[in-house]
């Protein structure tokens, strides 16, 4: 009697084990292969916008413009004197 009951149980257990992973445990379904790339692009866009806003709101552009203007003025004066 024990053998009679244990064989079907063994068959059921083996069929469950050998069936493989359930669909939810399998590989994730990829609806669009470019979703990850799109997310990366949006992140890059946000970071770039934040960087540009930070630069435009800082004093760095004004300081650079003043430095270039002063350097250009000095070079111009030096060339005027030498000529």
From Swiss-Prot:
One of its GO terms (biological process) is very-low-density lipoprotein particle clearance. The keyword NAD does not apply. It is found in: Secreted. It holds the Pfam family ApoC-I. InterPro entries: ApoC-1_sf (IPR043081), ApoC-I (IPR006781). Belongs to the apolipoprotein C1 family. This is Apolipoprotein C-I, acidic form. The lineage of its organism: Eukaryota, Metazoa, Chordata, Craniata, Vertebrata.
């Amino acid at each position: 009697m024990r053998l009679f009951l244990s064989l079907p149980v063994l068959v059921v257990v083996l069929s469950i084990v050998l069936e493989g992973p359930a669909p939810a445990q399998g590989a994730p379904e990829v609806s669009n292969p470019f979703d990850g790339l799109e997310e990366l692009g949006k992140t890059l866009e946000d970071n770039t916008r934040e960087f540009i806003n930070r630069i435009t709101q800082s004093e760095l552009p004004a300081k650079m413009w003043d430095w270039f203007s002063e350097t250009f003025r000095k070079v111009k004066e030096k060339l005027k004197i030498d000529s």
